[in-house]
């Protein structure tokens, strides 16, 4: 017990760890999906000075010694894109040995789902020259292994859409069937028959039809909520 305490004191005084094993750096990378009612978008930043300068990449960065990985993800997202109050969910860890040419880096991937219109004022900050939304089907060449990270995030988005409806975060609180169909087509890269989709969708127990002011003749244009 005394030996452990002594190590803690030494670590506090020297501000460094005492372990003999080399340490990998830890980063957070954020895949922020946005939906505009028709297509799926990804929020990217243009890198500043250093490795992969002027390449587009995911917003993210190195974890500070005094913060959690979740705090790191939120901080980096806000610093580099000005996006605030974003719900982030961890989806995967990427640890390929040579994924970063600078040093040994393990990154934790975070997935975010937003309505693109709510974050139209994104802008580059900190070490990001620029922040911009890109259509998921038209992504530029990316730095590091970020193409792989986005693909994994897209797969995770599909899983969450099937299991817990997380992708509904991309819709307004009240939404039309056609808007949901567009979202599903964007997420699953599949075209759905409008009539069959409507029948399957309206039978879901967690979907409520808005009985507000819609006349019976306009049921196909009705709005729904969770």
What are these regions (language model features)?
Residues 15-57, 70:
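N-terminal strand-loop-strand
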Residues 42, 47-49, 53, 60, ...:
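Short, His- and charge-rich active-site/binding loops that engage polyanionic ligands
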Residues 121-157, 170-178, 196-206:
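NUDIX/MutT-family hydrolases
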Residues 182-190:
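Short helix-coil junctions and helix-kink-helix linkers
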């Amino acid at each position: 017990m005394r030996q452990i305490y002594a190590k803690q004191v030494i670590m506090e005084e020297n501000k460094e760890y005492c372990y003999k094993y080399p340490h990998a750096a830890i980063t957070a990378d954020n895949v922020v999906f946005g939906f505009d009612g028709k297509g799926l978008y990804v929020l990217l930043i243009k890198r500043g000075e250093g490795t992969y300068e002027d390449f587009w990449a995911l917003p993210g960065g190195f974890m500070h010694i005094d913060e959690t990985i979740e705090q790191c993800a939120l901080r980096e997202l806000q610093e580099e894109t000005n996006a605030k109050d974003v719900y982030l969910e961890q989806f995967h860890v990427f640890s390929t040995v040579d994924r970063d040419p600078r040093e040994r880096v393990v990154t934790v991937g975070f997935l975010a789902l937003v309505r693109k219109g709510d974050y139209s004022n994104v802008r580059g900050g900190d070490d990001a020259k620029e922040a911009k939304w890109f259509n998921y089907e038209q992504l530029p060449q990316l730095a590091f292994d970020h193409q792989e990270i986005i693909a994994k995030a897209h797969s995770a988005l599909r899983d969450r859409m099937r299991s817990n409806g997380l992708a509904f975060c991309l819709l307004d609180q009240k939404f039309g069937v056609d808007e949901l169909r567009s979202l599903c087509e964007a997420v699953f890269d599949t075209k759905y028959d409008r009539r069959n989709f409507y029948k399957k969708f309206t039978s879901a127990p967690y979907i409520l039809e808005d009985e507000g002011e819609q006349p019976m003749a306009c049921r196909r244009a009705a709005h729904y909520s969770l």
